[in-house]
């Protein structure tokens, strides 16, 4: 009887060891199509948020008569222009998925520091509640892109060291004209960079999973 009891305990222990996941990868993985769909939705949301934030700032602080001249003067240089990233859909279609993912990751990571100061320039605005969560949304997208990179890892050369700079933080001294112009330029770059990231992700999703929404 004792032998039977010991055998039963050993069998139970063995079954538990077999069923317990040995590593994170033992859990069911999300389908690649779902990973792409989630990343695209996050990028679209962030791009729209960046565009809305830019418009709100412009409406609140930049006189209408000065907007065109300021935009043409390129008051802020976007660091993303220093990397050999595609500038549009057509160029993006000529790059591999891994290249586009790495460029997307670089763009997102370059804003993780600066956006932590974004909510401070909208303390008296309806945009405050939204802008205060931008950092968390960027982190979510960063994790989504990294998950895609792990799925598609192909051993190709990395481009992660190309963009070492990050953007300056947003200036909270809203009584200074220089600060206003700086923030206006940063928001313009933020909008452009998120548009690029969204474009790259949509190009990848469309060429892997042909669908009617590929025309954009």
Swiss-Prot record:
GO molecular function terms attached to this record: growth factor activity; growth hormone receptor binding; hormone activity; metal ion binding
Binding site for Zn(2+): 45, 198
Record's subcellular location: Secreted
Signal sequence, start to end: 1-26
Name of a matching Pfam family: Hormone_1
Keyword match Magnesium: no
Keywords in alphabetical order: Disulfide bond, Hormone, Metal-binding, Phosphoprotein, Secreted, Signal, Zinc
GO CC annotations on file: extracellular space
InterPro entries: 4_helix_cytokine-like_core (IPR009079), Somatotropin (IPR034975), Somatotropin/Prolactin (IPR001400), Somatotropin_CS (IPR018116)
GO biological process terms held by the UniProt record: animal organ development; growth hormone receptor signaling pathway; positive regulation of growth; positive regulation of receptor signaling pathway via JAK-STAT; response to nutrient levels
Residue numbers bearing the Phosphoserine modification: 131
Primary location group: secreted
Paired cysteines (S-S): 78-189, 206-214
Function according to Swiss-Prot or TrEMBL: Plays an important role in growth control. Its major role in stimulating body growth is to stimulate the liver and other tissues to secrete IGF1. It stimulates both the differentiation and proliferation of myoblasts. It also stimulates amino acid uptake and protein synthesis in muscle and other tissues.
Family: Belongs to the somatotropin/prolactin family.
Identification of the protein by name: Somatotropin
Organism whose genome encodes this protein: Mesocricetus auratus
